[in-house]
């Protein structure tokens, strides 16, 4: 107690350790907010430097999130994944971290790791439709069509208007030649968005498989009119012409696309 009063009345300065902590915190905040400003100004390289300097002082979860998103935008998925794995260890109860990690693993085509991340998200939040969708994508990447459909069906049950899940399920059903079930998904998607290009292309593939070449051609052409840069539409249409022995039309189409 006497030591306390002595230091209080004598006006002694803070200990070197306490002063260092204050300086470190100040420098951390400067680097962090400089990084955010750089990000807003469209200078990702400088933002990365600032966030990296900030994290060298303090491994703060929020700043790690900012940096991981930057790495994803810049295509540096290995660095993003390393950060996200650290974040998942720091805050293992956050679904969003595992969802982002699953998406990064998908970009890297590491489907087993993607499946693990999606399963961890589901363990935290069973009713998360996106997590079940990502699990379906992971099984699709491992060529497991039946489990892909099962997980996508769960996602759609949780979120009936989940366009991406319906499109992926339709694509998988096409592989299995289950056209009736596939068209239920296509019709549901087109009811929400009549100009959904992937849905129209898949509908064209069903018509083509059923021997309705002219109707398939209409769908493929419609997509090229909506979006002249949709390469898949030109490929499907060109392949249809080749199958119909319309080689002149196919060559002309591919020349136009190029």
Q: Where do the PLM segments sit?
A:
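Register position in tetratricopeptide repeats
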Residues: 40-41, 73-74, 107, 141-142, ...
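TPR-adjacent "capping" and linker segments in tetratricopeptide-repeat scaffold/adaptor proteins
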Residues: 8-30, 53-56
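Helix-start (N-cap) detector for alpha-helical repeat units in TPR-like alpha-solenoids
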Residues: 28, 61-63, 95-96, 129-130, ...
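Short coil turns that delineate tetratricopeptide repeat
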Residues: 25, 58-59, 92, 126, ...
């Amino acid at each position: 107690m006497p030591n306390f009063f002595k230091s209080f009345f004598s006006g002694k300065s803070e200990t070197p350790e306490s002063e260092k902590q204050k300086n470190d915190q100040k420098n951390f905040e400067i680097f962090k907010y400089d990084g955010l400003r750089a990000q807003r100004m469209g200078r990702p390289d400088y933002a990365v430097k600032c966030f990296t300097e900030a994290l060298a002082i303090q491994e703060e979860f929020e700043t790690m999130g900012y940096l991981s998103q930057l790495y994803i935008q810049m295509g540096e998925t290995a660095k993003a994944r390393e950060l996200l794995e650290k974040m998942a260890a720091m805050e293992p109860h956050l679904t969003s971290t595992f969802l982002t990690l699953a998406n990064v693993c998908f970009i890297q085509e590491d489907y087993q790791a993607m499946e693990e991340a999606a399963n961890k998200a589901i363990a935290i939040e069973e009713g998360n439709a996106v997590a079940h969708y990502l699990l379906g994508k992971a099984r699709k990447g491992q060529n497991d069509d039946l489990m892909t459909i099962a997980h996508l069906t769960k996602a759609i049950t949780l979120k009936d208007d989940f366009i991406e899940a319906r499109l992926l399920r339709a694509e998988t059903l096409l592989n299995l030649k289950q056209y009736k079930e596939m068209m239920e998904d296509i019709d549901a998607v087109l009811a929400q968005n009549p100009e959904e290009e992937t849905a129209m292309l898949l509908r064209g593939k069903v018509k083509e498989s059923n021997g309705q070449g002219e109707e398939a051609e209409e769908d493929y052409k419609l997509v090229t009119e909506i979006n002249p840069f949709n390469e898949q539409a030109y490929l499907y249409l060109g392949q249809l012409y080749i199958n119909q022995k319309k080689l002149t039309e196919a060559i002309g189409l591919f020349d136009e696309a190029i």
